[in-house]
A protein has these predicted regions:
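Catalytic core of non-heme Fe(II) oxygenases with the double-stranded beta-helix
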Residues: 82-159, 166-169, 175
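Non-heme Fe(II)/2-oxoglutarate
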Residues: 1-84
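Short non-domain terminal segments
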Residues: 46, 51, 147-148, 172
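Aromatic-acidic/polar surface patches that form glycan- and anion
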Residues: 62, 66, 109, 163
C-alpha cells in the first residue's frame, strides 16, 4: 500500500491506515539496530511514568532503516493532509516490554497537523492502541509494518503488553516547515 492507497479505518475521527513496502526487511534492520543502541544514543527521553520513559528520542542516523519509515510516513501524511510540499516530522521510539503500558495523552503541544505511529514489532496481545472520541472508545490491534495516522488532539493510550516479547513502535508528529 502506498501513500495514495490509504485506508480510513474509522471515519468519525479520520484515522487512516497504510502499510510500508518491504516492511519485513525494514523492520528486521530496525530491530537489529535497536538491539545495539545504548543510553548514550538517545538525545532525550520523556514521560517517565510507571518506571520507564515512554518516549525515546534519537537522531535519524542512529537507527538503520528508520529513514525509510519516515520518508514513507511523510508521503502518507502529505496525502492525508492534501499538503503537496514537505512537512516537518518529529519522531520517537516507544519501547514496551512485558507489562508496560503507555498512558493516555494527546499530541497537540505545538503546531502539529497529524500524528502517527508505525509498528516495528508487535507480538500478539502486546497492547492495543485505544482512541477516545468523547464517550466512544476504539481499540486497534497493532501489526508490524502498519502505519496509523490520526488527529493530534485525539486522546489515546496503549494497553498493557501481555506478551513476553518486545513491542516497538515509532511515534510521529507532522507539522508545517518553519
Amino acid at each position: 500500500m502506498n501513500a495514495t492507497q490509504l485506508t480510513q479505518v474509522w471515519t468519525s475521527t479520520q484515522v487512516h491506515q497504510a502499510a510500508l513496502p518491504e516492511a519485513e526487511a525494514v523492520n528486521a534492520e530496525i530491530l537489529a539496530g535497536f538491539a545495539g543502541l545504548t543510553p548514550e544514543d538517545y538525545r532525550y527521553r520523556s514521560h517517565f511514568i510507571a518506571g520507564r520513559f515512554e518516549n525515546l528520542y534519537l537522531e535519524r542516523t542512529r537507527l538503520p532503516g528508520i529513514e525509510r519509515v519516515l520518508i514513507h510516513a511523510e508521503g502518507c501524511a502529505r496525502a492525508i493532509l492534501g499538503h503537496p510540499g514537505p512537512l516537518r516530522c518529529g519522531f520517537w521510539l516507544n519501547v514496551m516490554e512485558a507489562g508496560h503500558t503507555t498512558s493516555e495523552h494527546t499530541h497537540e503541544e505545538n503546531d502539529e497537523l497529524l500524528s502517527g505511529v508505525y509498528y516495528v514489532a508487535a507480538p500478539p496481545v502486546s497492547g492495543d492502541l485505544v482512541l477516545r472520541d468523547g464517550p466512544l472508545l476504539v481499540r486497534l490491534t497493532p501489526s508490524p509494518g502498519t502505519f496509523l495516522f490520526f488527529p493530534p488532539d485525539l486522546p489515546h493510550w496503549v494497553e498493557s503488553n501481555r506478551s513476553p516479547g518486545l513491542r516497538l513502535s515509532i511515534g510521529m508528529n507532522f507539522g508545517p516547515l518553519e
